[in-house]
């Protein structure tokens, strides 16, 4: 039996770090929303008891470093599944980009194998399992728009922001989240107003959303990789309604309401950035249907 599953990327409309926890993780408060840029996974049941990862993308590991592999392994061990699975990952989301591509692949694997192996788990149970794999996996199981707290695994759903274009530009570098957090000095950064962002999203206030976007990690990544700051400045000059770095970077996104301006910004960015995408916000949460 074979199953196709979609794994959408996420952006952070607001990201704050409150402090470091005793377990070594950072306490965060952020708003994430899924966008229509997605990897596609094909899950095929194997009679033999093994996990196989296949991808044409050379940056996708085919062993337990891969979060989709970890998701399959977790389900096999927790529920004593004796069958195997072959997971083919068609990558569209850039790797190490701040868009939760690996986490979304893991979440899609959890949802898909729940169906393929007839495990009968609820989406809440899958999200709880996702937290054992990575901080963003719980959110990616649900999708939609949510406030994430704790280390990112505590999810509270909120309304979907008004529909708009999201233009993404990723420079030809990868950023490691641990390096960014390691250089973060909480008393030297600008903290965004996450609560205000919740209010303007719930009010459907597009201008308010654009005025309130913020990411506490931006200055850290900009200092390490000045080219990320240059992309943000360029996107602003081209006329995006709001511009922000997603996650720990290096991808920068712009929110744009009008089609004509979206095309102008997209074409302008293609002139000096290799990976540029224009996609829409995804309004709906995932279901198990």
From Swiss-Prot:
Associated pathway: Isoprenoid biosynthesis; isopentenyl diphosphate biosynthesis via DXP pathway; isopentenyl diphosphate from 1-deoxy-D-xylulose 5-phosphate: step 3/6
Q: In the record, what terms sit under GO molecular function?
A: 4-(cytidine 5'-diphospho)-2-C-methyl-D-erythritol kinase activity; ATP binding
Pfam families with a match to the protein in the record: GHMP_kinases_C, GHMP_kinases_N
Q: Keywords on this record? A: ATP-binding, Isoprene biosynthesis, Kinase, Nucleotide-binding, Transferase
Q: Which domain of life is it from?
A: Bacteria
Enzyme active site: 10, 136
Gene3D superfamilies reported for this sequence: 3.30.230.10, GHMP kinase, C-terminal domain
Some GO term, biological process aspect, for this entry: which one?
Answer: isopentenyl diphosphate biosynthetic process, methylerythritol 4-phosphate pathway
Q: Which residues bind ATP?
A: 94-104
Protein's UniProt keywords contain Transferase: yes
Q: Which InterPro entries match?
A: GHMP_kinase_C_dom, GHMP_kinase_C_sf, GHMP_kinase_N_dom, IspE, Ribosomal_Su5_D2-typ_SF, Ribsml_uS5_D2-typ_fold_subgr
Q: Which reaction does it catalyse?
A: 4-CDP-2-C-methyl-D-erythritol + ATP = 4-CDP-2-C-methyl-D-erythritol 2-phosphate + ADP + H(+)
Looking at the keywords, is ATP-binding present?
A: yes
Q: Which family does it belong to?
A: Belongs to the GHMP kinase family. IspE subfamily.
Protein name according to UniProt: 4-diphosphocytidyl-2-C-methyl-D-erythritol kinase
Q: Which organism is it from?
A: Bacillus anthracis
The top of its lineage is:
Bacteria, Bacillati, Bacillota, Bacilli, Bacillales
């Amino acid at each position: 039996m074979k199953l196709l599953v979609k794994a959408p990327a996420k952006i952070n409309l607001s990201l704050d770090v409150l402090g470091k926890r005793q377990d070594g993780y950072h306490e965060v408060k952020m708003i994430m929303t899924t966008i229509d840029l997605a990897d596609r996974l094909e899950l095929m049941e194997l009679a033999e008891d093994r996990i196989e990862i296949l991808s044409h993308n050379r940056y996708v590991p085919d062993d337990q470093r891969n979060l989709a592999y970890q998701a399959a392994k977790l389900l096999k061990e927790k529920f004593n599944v004796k069958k195997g699975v072959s997971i083919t990952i068609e990558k569209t989301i850039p790797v190490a980009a701040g868009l939760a591509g690996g986490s979304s692949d893991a979440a899609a694997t959890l949802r898909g194998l729940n169906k393929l192996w007839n495990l009968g788990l609820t989406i809440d149970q899958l999200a709880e399992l996702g937290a054992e794999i990575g901080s963003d996996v719980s959110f990616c199981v649900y999708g939609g728009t949510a406030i994430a707290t704790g280390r990112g695994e505590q999810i509270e759903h909120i309304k979907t922001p008004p529909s708009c274009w999201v233009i993404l530009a990723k420079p030809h570098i990868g950023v490691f989240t641990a390096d960014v957090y390691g250089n973060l000095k909480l008393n030297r950064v600008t903290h965004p107003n996450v609560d205000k962002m919740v209010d303007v999203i719930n009010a459907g206030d597009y201008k308010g959303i654009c005025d309130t976007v913020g990411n506490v990690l931006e200055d850290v990544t900009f200092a390490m990789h000045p080219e990320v700051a240059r992309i943000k400045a360029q996107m602003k000059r081209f006329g995006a309604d709001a511009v922000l770095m997603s996650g720990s970077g290096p991808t920068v996104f712009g929110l744009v309401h009008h089609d004509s301006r979206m095309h102008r910004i997209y074409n302008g960015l293609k002139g000096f950035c290799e990976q540029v995408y224009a996609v829409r916000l995804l309004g709906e949460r995932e279901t198990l249907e």
